[in-house]
C-alpha cells in the first residue's frame, strides 16, 4: 500500500532547548494557523513568529501532497488545504482500486502514444484501412489532441470536440475554422475508432486509468442517402455513351453486382465461361501513400459470382487476345485502370452526355444497387443475395435492401388458410 501525507511548506515546529540540553519540538498553535489561513493572500499580516516560519514562508503554494508508489516518491503542490486533502484521498482510493496512474505517465502526450499505436497498426490490418485511420488521425485527431497530456484528456473536453466536429469548427490539419462539418458516420470513425484506440492503448499500458471516450455521446446518424435503382433501359442509356469495352464494364457492374474496385481488379483468368462465373478475390484500394493497390475484398471474403448468359459475348470481347494474368477491364494503354480514373474519365462524362448527371444519389455504386433490385425481383432470397454480393451477414443485406422485398403477408395468410382444419 502506498503511503501519502500532506506537508505544510510555510509552517514548521519551533525547536526549544531545555535546561538539560534536550530538544523539544513545539508545533504552531491553533491561533497561529487560523491567523495564517485568514491572510493567505498576504501572509505577513498573520504576524507568524519567526520560529514557526520555514525558509519558503509565503512563497508559492502552501501545501504539498507527498506519496510513494511504484518505488518512487511523488509530490503535488496545492494552495488550498481542502483541495490537497481531496487529492490525497482520491489518490489513495485510486491506488486501492488499481486505478492509480504514475504522474509521469499522465504527462505523456497523446501524440507520443499515437506514434506507438501507429507502429502497432502496420501489418495488422488491411493497407486501405490503415490508410483511412492514419488520414483521420492526421487531419482531425492530432490537430486537437496531439500536444495534450493524457492526464488532461477528459470526457467533457472530448464531448466539446465532438460538437466542434459537427459544427465544422474543429481544428483540422493544424488550422482552425475550416468550416467543414463531419457527417455522423465519419465522426464515429474519428472518435470511437481512431481517437478511442489510441487512448485504449494508453489504458492497457497503465498510462490512463480509464478511457474518457467511453462516455462520449455521438450525433445520431442521418438517413442514408437515397439509393438509386436503374432500369435496364437507363443502364443502356449510360452504356451507350461509352466505348464498347467500357459499356461492357457497365453491364458487368449492373448485372453481376460486383463493386467497381472488384471489377477493375479482375483478371481474364478470373472468368470461367464454362460455368459462367467470376472469381472475386481482389479489389482496388489505396495505401498510406495514396497509391492504388490491390487487396482482399471487403470483409476479407472471396466469392464466386454468377454471370448472366447475355454477357458472354461482351466478356469474350474484353478477354480476346489477352492472357489469363491480364486485366479484364484495362486502362487505355493496358495495365491497371484505377477507380478514380474510370470515374473521372469514363463514368462522369457518360452521365453528362446521357443527361443523367443531375440525378440525386446516382453513383457507380448505383449499378450494384440495381443488380440487387433485379435479383430480388427475380426471386432471390436473402442468403443467396448475401453470398453473391459479398455482404458480411444476411442482416446487412436485409438492412440495405429491406424495402425491395415485397410484402407477402397476405400470401402467407392465404397459404395457411388452405391448411386449416376446423
Label for each model-derived stretch:
Residues 1-119, 123, 131-135, 139, ...:
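Basic/aromatic DNA-contact patch characteristic of tyrosine site-specific recombinases
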Residues 171-174, 236-247, 256, 305, ...:
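Short, basic (Lys/Arg/His-rich) helix/loop patches that form interaction surfaces
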Amino acid at each position: 500500500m502506498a503511503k501519502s501525507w500532506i506537508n505544510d511548506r510555510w509552517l514548521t515546529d519551533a525547536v526549544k532547548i531545555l535546561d538539560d540540553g534536550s530538544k523539544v519540538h513545539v508545533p504552531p498553535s491553533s491561533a497561529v494557523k487560523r491567523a495564517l489561513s485568514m491572510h493567505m493572500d498576504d501572509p505577513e499580516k498573520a504576524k507568524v513568529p519567526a520560529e514557526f516560519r520555514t525558509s519558503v514562508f509565503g512563497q508559492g503554494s502552501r501545501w504539498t501532497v507527498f506519496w510513494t508508489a511504484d518505488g518512487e516518491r511523488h509530490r503535488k503542490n496545492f494552495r488550498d488545504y481542502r483541495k490537497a486533502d481531496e487529492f490525497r484521498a482520491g489518490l489513495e482510493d485510486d491506488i486501492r482500486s488499481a486505478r492509480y496512474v504514475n504522474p509521469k505517465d499522465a504527462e505523456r502526450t497523446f501524440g507520443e502514444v499515437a506514434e506507438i499505436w501507429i507502429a502497432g497498426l502496420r501489418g495488422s490490418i488491411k493497407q486501405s484501412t490503415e490508410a483511412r485511420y492514419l488520414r483521420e488521425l492526421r487531419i482531425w485527431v492530432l490537430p486537437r489532441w496531439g500536444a495534450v497530456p493524457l492526464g488532461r484528456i477528459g470526457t467533457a473536453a472530448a464531448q466539446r470536440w465532438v460538437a466542434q466536429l459537427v459544427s465544422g469548427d474543429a481544428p483540422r490539419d493544424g488550422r482552425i475554422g475550416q468550416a467543414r462539418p463531419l457527417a455522423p458516420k465519419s465522426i464515429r470513425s474519428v472518435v470511437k475508432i481512431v481517437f478511442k484506440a489510441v487512448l485504449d492503448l494508453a489504458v492497457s499500458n497503465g498510462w490512463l486509468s480509464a478511457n474518457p471516450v467511453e462516455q462520449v455521446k455521438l450525433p445520431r446518424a442521418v438517413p442514408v442517402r437515397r439509393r438509386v435503382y436503374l432500369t435496364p433501359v437507363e443502364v443502356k442509356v449510360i452504356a451507350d455513351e461509352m466505348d464498347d469495352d467500357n459499356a461492357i464494364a457497365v453491364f458487368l457492374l449492373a448485372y453481376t453486382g460486383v463493386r467497381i474496385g472488384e471489377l477493375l481488379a479482375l483478371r481474364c483468368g478470373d472468368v470461367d465461361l464454362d460455368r459462367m462465373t467470376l472469381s472475386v478475390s481482389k479489389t482496388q484500394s489505396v495505401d498510406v501513400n495514396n497509391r492504388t493497390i490491390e487487396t482482399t475484398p471487403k470483409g476479407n471474403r472471396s466469392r464466386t459470382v454468377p454471370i448472366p448468359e447475355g454477357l458472354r459475348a461482351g466478356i469474350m470481347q474484353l478477354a480476346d487476345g489477352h492472357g489469363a494474368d491480364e486485366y479484364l477491364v484495362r486502362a487505355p494503354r493496358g495495365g491497371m485502370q484505377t477507380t478514380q480514373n474510370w470515374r473521372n474519365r469514363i463514368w462522369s462524362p457518360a452521365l453528362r452526355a446521357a443527361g443523367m448527371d443531375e440525378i440525386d444519389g446516382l453513383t457507380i455504386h448505383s449499378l450494384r444497387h440495381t443488380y440487387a433490385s433485379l435479383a430480388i425481383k427475380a426471386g432471390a432470397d436473402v442468403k443467396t443475395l448475401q453470398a453473391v454480393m459479398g455482404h458480411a451477414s444476411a442482416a446487412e443485406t436485409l438492412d440495405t435492401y429491406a424495402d425491395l422485398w415485397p410484402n407477402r403477408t397476405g400470401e402467407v395468410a392465404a397459404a395457411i388458410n388452405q391448411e386449416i382444419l376446423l
